[in-house]
UniProtKB/Swiss-Prot annotation:
Keywords: Calcium, Cell adhesion, Cell membrane, Cleavage on pair of basic residues, Cytoplasm, Glycoprotein, GPI-anchor, Lipoprotein, Membrane, Metal-binding, Repeat, Signal. Neural tissues. Also found in muscles; kidney and retina. This is Cadherin-13. Residues 23-138, 694-712 form a propeptide. It comes from Gallus gallus.
């Protein structure tokens, strides 16, 4: 059929040419038909005629010679174009050069695909200047060359031919470009005389698919006389690359219960062969599915796109009934459009069946029991639930709620993140005497909402029965802490207060005894029976055991239980001040030069441990002695300070000045004390206070004092 089509195309073209040239009856040297269209067959068969070429030099065609651009073809003497071997790829065109003693010409054979026949016929019937008009001659004919990759030796191997219309006498061909004199060098070469192009080693289309060379014709001296013209060499792809999956790992997810035909993922492979040929035309197939239940054909892969889709019903796509939620598919990609001769590559697709919340959590039993001692807090029971959904997801994680029986908010429940159990805790201590039993109603839900048409049922609620055990609780003081105000220095044995403690265990009718637990100053005692607290020592507000006027003591209340329980009470005594401390004077030592110009010796201050109004203003006075009053005096500065002033310069010596200071308390308290005054000699900024004359001066003062007393 293909041969008939070729003949039809050639016949039509020849008829058109004959019609176009019918008026020209003179012989025109050359090919009588210059353009041919033939349909690309699956293969050109060796020695089978392809078409007939008619050449006439109008002189008898003596010494007629034909040259074909592709060395796999030749033209017989009768003009028949034949293949020298079986040829599956001849390119898009063949050029035939014919030469005799009197004429030469070029014919072009265009090879078209089956889908191009219509366009070829249109070209044949197109009325244009090319019909009947001799084609312009080409000086160098360099038709494209096609070379299959991965050819086997021997090399070099002839792959094409360059033709010069003028012949090559006195001239030679020269080839240049990438693959000749540029890297990679030495792949191609040309016979300088015949124009035969040869390849020297196997080619790899995936490395270089096309070579663009230049052909020139030079004279024997190397001068270019024709060209350059471009020579295209294309490497014909062979199926020498397997499909490869490069984007792994391949993991897809599909929700359980998804409709049949749900797309899970896409698997695509890469083939390094020519994408325009079947060598890279891939088809996909599932070789193996693991596991094979509930169906050995859970999934389908689109052979062209590589899309993996579900093919089972939503009922079978149930995660909870599956042997495992993970499926592994061995995917095969085969080139050559999936034909048996194609090369293959495989990869594994992992498909995970994702969970949806189609199973509510359910308690493992309807009623749980718990026992807790009164007064204790913490977890008292773990509530267990079952959920068939995927663990560690929101469809599995439980959320617990106390919906009844917790008016006092004594209980809380939280989820154990590892076990999903509900941890029920007492957060406020329970009292046996108030209630010995508690009943809680607990509800469990999921973090994620249930899917439509699924609801929480009776198994999603449970009852917890809690029994409170009685324990011997310690007595409780009322109030606690206790506060009282007392004046310091009250008589020993004075009653401070009576403490009161009660036993929470009202049903046990226990007795209570009291004792002192902590009394830092040992000032107090307590009656063990009635709780009366009395003083055993004088209360002193100025004691180091008193802080901010408060004294703190602790007492114990002990019941008669077995074993006994103890309660602790705190007593704060606020002490009121009384004037029981004399003022103190400072400083007690002063120094002055014997020739001082400023006779103001020192400023005295007074302080008192008591509180107002038992402190300042203070009264400063010299003691009632006539002798000292003649030597110095005291001037009041303010409520807390006074100044000692000399009445005259004194000789170097140590003097003791008797001074009294009195507070403002009722009654006031006076402190009689002495100020030691050192009179020193001062020379050149040095003060000498050695007491060489101190004994003399002191004795003089003593004698003067005695004399004044005697005279009285």
């Amino acid at each position: 059929m293909q041969h008939k089509t070729q003949l039809t195309l050639s016949f039509l073209l020849s008829q058109v040419l004959l019609l176009a040239c019918a008026e020209d009856l003179e012989c025109t040297p050359g090919f009588q038909q210059k353009v041919f269209y033939i349909e690309q067959p699956f293969e050109f068969t060796e020695d089978q005629p392809i078409l007939n070429l008619v050449f006439d030099d109008c002189k008898g065609n003596n010494k007629l010679n034909f040259e074909v651009s592709n060395p796999d073809f030749k033209v017989e003497h009768d003009g028949s174009l034949v293949a020298l071997k079986n040829v599956s790829e001849a390119g898009r065109a063949l050029f035939v050069h014919a030469r005799s003693e009197h004429a030469e010409d070029m014919a072009e054979i265009l090879i078209v695909g089956a889908d191009e026949k219509h366009d070829a016929l249109k070209e044949i019937f197109k009325i244009e200047g090319n019909l009947g008009i001799p084609r312009q001659k080409r000086a160098i004919l360099a038709t494209p060359i096609l070379i299959p990759e991965n050819q086997r030796p021997p090399f070099p191997r002839s792959v094409g031919k360059v033709i010069r219309s003028e012949g090559t006498e006195g001239a030679k061909f020269r080839l240049s470009g990438k693959g000749v004199d540029q890297d990679p060098k030495g792949i191609f070469r040309i016979n300088e005389i015949s124009g035969d192009v040869s390849v020297t080693r196997p080619l790899d289309r995936e490395a270089i698919a096309n070579y663009e060379l230049e052909v020139e014709v030079t004279d024997l001296s190397g001068k270019i006389i024709d060209g350059p013209v471009r020579l295209d060499i294309s490497v014909i792809d062979q199926n020498d690359n397997r499909p490869m999956f490069k984007e792994g790992p391949y993991v897809g997810h599909v929700m359980e219960g998804s409709p049949t035909g749900t797309t899970v993922m896409r698997m695509t492979a890469f083939d390094a062969d020519d994408p325009s040929t079947d060598n890279a035309l891939l088809r996909y197939n599932i070789l193996k599915q693991t596991p094979t239940k509930p169906s050995p054909n859970m999934f389908y892969i689109d052979p062209e796109k590589g899309d993996i889709v579900t093919v089972v019903s939503p009922v079978l796509l149930d995660r909870e009934t599956m042997e495992t939620p993970k499926y592994e598919l061995v995917i095969e990609a085969k080139d050559m459009g999936g034909h048996d001769v194609g090369l293959t590559g495989t990869a594994t697709a992992t498909i995970l069946i994702d969970d949806k919340n189609d199973h509510p959590p359910e308690f493992t039993k309807k009623e749980f029991q718990a026992t807790v001692k009164e007064g204790v807090t913490g977890v008292i029971v773990n509530l267990t639930v079952g959920d068939r959904d995927d663990p560690a997801t929101g469809a599995w994680r439980a959320v617990y709620t106390i919906i009844n029986g917790n008016p006092g908010q004594s209980f809380e429940i939280h989820t154990n993140p590892q076990t999903n159990e509900g941890m029920l805790s007492v957060v406020k201590p329970l009292d046996y005497e108030i209630s010995a039993f508690h009943t809680l109603l607990i509800k469990v839900e999921n973090e994620d909402p249930l899917i439509p048409d699924i609801a929480y049922g009776p198994s999603s609620t449970a009852t917890v029965q809690i029994t409170v055990e009685d324990v011997n609780e310690g007595p409780v003081f009322h109030p606690n802490p206790m506060t009282v105000t007392k004046q310091e220095n009250i008589p020993i044995g004075s009653i401070v207060l009576t403490v009161n403690a009660t036993d929470p265990d009202t049903l046990q009718h226990q007795t209570i005894r009291y004792s002192v637990y902590k009394d830092p100053a040992s000032w107090l005692e307590i009656n063990p029976t009635n709780g009366t607290v009395a003083t055993t020592a004088v209360l002193d507000r100025e004691s180091p055991h008193v802080q901010d006027n408060k004294y703190t003591a602790l007492f114990l209340a002990i019941d008669s239980g077995n074993p006994p329980a103890t309660g602790t009470g705190t007593l704060h005594i606020t002490l009121e001040d009384v004037n029981d401390n004399v003022p103190s004077l400072y400083p007690t030592l002063a120094k002055v030069c014997d020739d001082a110009k400023d006779l103001r010796v020192v400023v005295l201050g007074a302080s008192d441990k008591d509180l107002h109004p038992n402190t300042d203003p203070f009264k400063f006075e010299l003691s009632k002695q006539s002798g000292p009053e003649k030597l110095w005096r005291i001037n009041k500065l303010n409520n807390t300070h006074a100044q000692v002033v000399l009445l005259q310069n004194l000789k170097k010596a140590n003097y003791n000045i008797p001074i009294s200071v009195t507070d403002s308390g009722k009654p006031p308290l006076t402190n009689n004390t002495e100020l030691k005054l050192q009179v020193c000699s001062c020379k050149k900024s040095r003060m000498d206070c050695s007491a060489s004359d101190a004994l003399h001066i002191s004795m003089t003062l003593i004698l003067l004092s005695l004399f004044s007393l005697f005279c009285l």
